[in-house]
Every structure is written in structure tokens, then in C-alpha cells.
Amino acid sequence: MLVLGIESSCDETGLALYDTERGLLAHALHSQIAMHREYGGVVPELASRDHIRRALPLLEEVLAASGARRDDIDAIAFTQGPGLAGALLVGASIANALAFAWDKPTIGIHHLEGHLLSPLLVAEPPPFPFVALLVSGGHTQLMRVSDVGVYETLGETLDDAAGEAFDKTAKLLGLGYPGGPEVSRLAEAGTPGAVVLPRPMLHSGDLDFSFSGLKTAVLTQMKKLEAAHAGGAVLERAKADLARGFVDAAVDVLVAKSLAALKATRLKRLVVAGGVGANRQLRAALSAAAQKRGFDVHYPDLALCTDNGAMIALAGALRLARWPSQASRDYAFTVKPRWDLASLAR
């Protein structure tokens, strides 16, 4: 089965072709980072308009790269939610228009399910069941993944997502957009232990997260730094130490909660997905913990940590292989800007 996947939930336009026998044939991605940088964040209207401009050229790109023709495609999967309403509508409209014109069925995919399953795109995918740490700009969750569509929420953030805390910390430190990678780069120049920040809910006894207090701690420290240093090299070094303190605190919490989830479920496989999963400090800490505690940790390829069409094509193919009745030829689609992943549980 050959499935075309279309992702447009936020500020990346992604298209891909996934075959259930041959794997990922081609994927193409356009990021809107440069366009949104001058605004310091994603502008929804601009994001939607850019998806319109980019989708069809990306479609031509994946068809050419894969050697596939439209007649070879068996179904079209699209991100139905959650995400920005306008951006979702663009992707859904394009998917259903193509499906109508080509006489193909469609399937709407939960964006987070795509992330959860994205590590299955590697050469040696982890078998079910596993614990998944889903960590991105909008979500931080620990899930037990027993099979496609069989998900149990073990813990989640009670306020800010980890990626959101990274982005807000970047703004407090006067860094550019996107904030997460900028904070991580600055942190690598900081001195470990020079600034020690709180580890929220580290000993809460559950698997939930909270990052708003950590963000507030960064704000408090930044005000002290600005009062003590008028500027110059001293302030820049102090900001690097603060960034290091923030990243160390966030990573400590993510690792500790992941270990607790593995212990609670008695599983030995951890999958990390979402944009923050590309963070080098997080990967290093999890790898060290895995070696010490005797569990396996799996990630998608770095290029597939961000939003992409490959994960949507994969999720669509896996769902249709298990539940062919989910294929739809009713092109009166809806999108779901808010959509609880737990609602997919079978």
C-alpha cells in the first residue's frame, strides 16, 4: 500500500510517500522559520498562506524523487489536528481535493500519533510495546504505546510544554527565533553548576510535568543579571551559565520522569519523539541513563524530529493496514484544532 502524507499543522509544510512493503520512498519539507523570525513567533495567517504556496511544488518533488505516479497512490493521509485551524484547513483541503480528483480515499491523522510512530521509520524500528516521551513546543507527555492506536497517557504537563519553556527562556535571554535551538547552543557555552535552577515536580510521585515555575526562575535570575551587569562580555557569559542551568534542569526532569515511567510499566524500551527530541543534551542524558539502567532508547532521524509528512504517511499506512474501514471517500472533511490523543485509544 502506497500512502501520500500531508502535514500542515503549524509552520512546516511536509509531504511524503510511504509504502508498507518498501518503507519511506521520499519526503520533502519546507520550514517557515525564516518567514516568522522577524515576528519572533508563528503568525497563523502567514503560515496558512505559505502552506498554499508550497504544497503542490513539494508534491511534484516527492513524486519525482520516488518515481511514483499518482495512479500508484492508494490513499492520502493528512493531519486533521491538533494545530492551527487555518493551517490544518489548507492541508486538509489539498488532501481532499487531490483525493477527489484522483479517486482516492483519505484518512485524517492525529498529529501527535504521527510523532509517536515516527521512530518506526528507522532501519531497525523498536517493537511494541514501549514508553514514549512526546516532547515538543506544544506538548509534553509520557505514553504507553502497546500498538498502533493503543495508547495510554501516563503523565503530561500541567501547564507549559517543555518546548514552550525553551522558547520563552530564549526570549527572556534575548535570543532569536526559533528559541529552543538557540537556548541549547548558548547552554553549551555555559559552565555546569554555575546556576542551579529548580527541578519542578521532580519528586511529585507521579509522571506529570510542570515547566512554568522553571520559566519564572529564569526570569528572576535574568533580572538579577541585568541589574548586576550593565552589559558586555560579563553579561553574555552569565547568560550562557543561566541557559545551561535551565537546560540542565529541564533535561533532569524529562529523564527522571521517563525512568519512572519505564519502572511503572516494567518496560525496557523508551521512544523519544517531537522537536525537543533533537536536543543534544537530552539525548546524551538519556543515552547515559540507558547504559546505566539497562534499557533501550530510540529516536527518529534528526530530520524527522520536526513536523513532517513522513510520519503522517506512516501513520496513515499503518492505520489503513489494520482498519481498512477508516478509509473515507466522503470529502466533506473537518479539522480538529484541539484533539485529545487519548480519544484514539481502542
Curated annotation (Swiss-Prot):
Binds 1 Fe(2+) ion per subunit. It is an enzyme of class 2 (transferase). The keyword Secreted does not apply. It is found in: Cytoplasm. GO terms for molecular function: iron ion binding; N(6)-L-threonylcarbamoyladenine synthase activity. It comes from the Bacteria. GO terms for biological process: tRNA threonylcarbamoyladenosine modification. Its EC number is 2.3.1.234. GO terms for cellular component: cytoplasm. Substrate binds at L134, V135, S136, G137, G138, D167, G180, N279. Fe cation binds at H111, H115, D307. Its main location: cytoplasm. It catalyses: L-threonylcarbamoyladenylate + adenosine(37) in tRNA = N(6)-L-threonylcarbamoyladenosine(37) in tRNA + AMP + H(+). InterPro entries: ATPase_NBD, Gcp-like_dom, KAE1/TsaD, TsaD. Its cofactor is Fe(2+). Gene3D superfamilies: 3.30.420.40. Keywords: Acyltransferase, Cytoplasm, Iron, Metal-binding, Transferase, tRNA processing. Required for the formation of a threonylcarbamoyl group on adenosine at position 37 (t(6)A37) in tRNAs that read codons beginning with adenine. Is involved in the transfer of the threonylcarbamoyl moiety of threonylcarbamoyl-AMP (TC-AMP) to the N6 group of A37, together with TsaE and TsaB. TsaD likely plays a direct catalytic role in this reaction. Belongs to the KAE1 / TsaD family. This is tRNA N6-adenosine threonylcarbamoyltransferase. The lineage of its organism: Bacteria, Pseudomonadati, Pseudomonadota, Betaproteobacteria, Burkholderiales.
